[in-house]
Design a protein with these regions (language model features):
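Short, conserved sequence motifs used for protein processing/export or organelle targeting and
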Residues: 1-123
Length: 123
């Protein structure tokens, strides 16, 4: 059982604007160790930017947690919207609520996809 919350994602983006986003993972899956969870974020357009170098990183095109960042279930990052208008941007998230036993057994895993549309121009 896992819930993925993204706070700060706009319904409609302004081209070139940066948005501060908080990713929260909620689960009744309790950890018996230091490791609490993890995540991977991908975006179809624009750029993902690291805010907290200790706990997040860009790895092979994904924004993800670091080893230190696996101690948490909440992370912050920025998304810079594309500089030109595109019909839609898809923000994809995979989240894990770890049970802390250093194996994938009994970890809660979930995904979330959010569609972000451009701000409508006033005519």
């Amino acid at each position: 059982n896992i819930e993925i919350n993204l706070i700060g994602v706009p319904k409609n983006y302004i081209p070139g604007k940066e948005y501060l986003i908080t990713l929260e993972i909620k689960s009744d899956n309790e950890s018996i160790g230091e490791n609490q969870g993890g995540f991977a974020v991908n975006v179809s357009d624009g750029r993902l930017l690291v805010v907290d170098k200790m706990n997040t990183q860009i790895l092979e095109g994904y924004l993800t947690h670091t080893k230190e960042g696996s101690r948490y279930r909440s992370w912050k990052f920025r998304w810079k919207a594309p500089s030109r208008v595109v019909d839609e941007v898809i923000l994809s998230v995979m989240g894990v609520a770890s049970n802390g036993d250093f194996s994938p057994n009994m970890d809660a895993v979930g995904t979330e996809r959010i569609k972000i549309l451009p701000v409508k121009s006033k005519k």
